[in-house]
Design a protein with these regions (language model features):
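N-terminal export/targeting signal detector
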Residues: 1-11
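Juxtamembrane extracytosolic/periplasmic "stalk" immediately C-terminal to the first targeting helix
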Residues: 13-23
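Periplasmic scaffold and linker elements that assemble and bridge Gram-negative envelope complexes
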Residues: 23-265
Length: 265
């Protein structure tokens, strides 16, 4: 085991364990994750409802959210989505699988997993209830669409949906700065906390590339020890999954950086 990394992602915090060789060196580093993120801005102003949970993959033509200019249909969706009895067997089976998978893989040493699991189940429930609510009032939806006051937001490219902005959307391996590794400077704007949206403002964010990077500042000695190789093994402490990453070492303003390159499965 070579190192343990915590890096900025999601809230931009997660943990990796990086393995190289056979000697364990349990150092912890802060790192920055960079993905190809595109902010999708709204064409309309109104009440917003979301139908895809954070971190879900979407295909071309999938429904992500809806904008209701006068709010009537949105209120009906919100009211109908409070009824848990409307969850169909398919969605219920998916939620049960999520629970069973968590119970099977749960490790008491990583109690933080409970919070992630809770958020995931709540998001799945919210997604299922909102979609069912939308279908249950299809006549009202169709009427509002005909009146051009209700708008479904459909994806035009596949990718992974997220609902926050943080100012890192245009950061690359070529333009990152040392200040970006200071977590005290990090702030995140949660798009789902606002029940209404203005035209031209962000409604969601799409990650449309399977390639991504983690940038980690490392001591000179570490950079020197890695210079003769280009591949490293990573174990995700969150779920114990493992992956291999290629890497390069870059020096900038007197600091050495390990740049990990990964491809999502």
């Amino acid at each position: 085991v070579f190192n343990v990394f915590s890096y900025l992602t999601e809230t931009h915090i997660s943990v990796y364990e990086v393995e190289q060789g056979t000697i364990a060196v349990n150092n912890v580093y802060n790192g920055l994750i960079l993905r190809d993120e595109k902010i999708i801005n709204s064409d309309y102003s109104g009440a917003v409802n979301y139908y895809v949970k954070e971190g879900s993959k979407v295909a071309y033509g999938d429904l992500v959210c809806s904008i209701d200019e006068n709010g009537d249909v949105s209120n009906m969706i919100n009211e109908a989505s409070q009824d848990g009895s409307t969850i169909d067997s398919e969605n219920l089976a998916e939620i049960e699988k999520t629970i069973n998978d968590f119970l099977y893989a749960y490790d008491g040493k990583n109690y933080y997993q409970v919070y992630s699991f809770k958020d995931n189940v709540n998001a799945s429930l919210s997604e299922a209830l909102s979609v069912n609510a939308l279908n249950d009032i299809s006549d009202y939806v169709a009427s509002a669409e005909n009146n051009n006051t209700f708008h479904k937001v459909i994806t035009d490219v596949p990718g992974i949906v997220t609902y926050y902005t943080d100012g890192f959307e245009n950061v690359t391996v070529d333009n990152f700065t040392a200040a970006m590794f200071d977590e005290s400077n990090y702030s995140k704007n949660d798009l789902k906390t606002n029940p209404a949206i203005q035209a031209g403002s962000p409604e969601y964010k799409l990650i449309d590339s399977e390639y991504w990077n983690i940038i980690v500042p490392v001591p000179d000695a570490t950079a020197e020890s890695l210079k003769d190789d280009d591949t490293i093994k990573i174990r995700f402490l969150k779920d114990a999954k493992e992956a291999y990453a290629t890497y390069s070492i870059v020096g900038r303003d007197g600091q050495q950086y390990l740049i990990l390159s990964l491809k999502s499965a």
